[in-house]
Amino acid sequence: FGLPMLSILPKALCILLKRKC
């Protein structure tokens, strides 16, 4: 539960900020 979320959050943030992942 915890590990998948940690890997998904950074990707979601860079997409929302329109930054290169």
Curated annotation (Swiss-Prot):
GO terms for cellular component: extracellular region. Expressed by the skin glands. It comes from Rana japonica. Keywords: Amphibian defense peptide, Antibiotic, Antimicrobial, Disulfide bond, Secreted. Antibacterial activity against the Gram-negative bacterium E.coli and the Gram-positive bacterium S.aureus. Disulfide bonds join C14-C21. This is Japonicin-2. One of its GO terms (biological process) is defense response to Gram-positive bacterium. It is found in: Secreted.
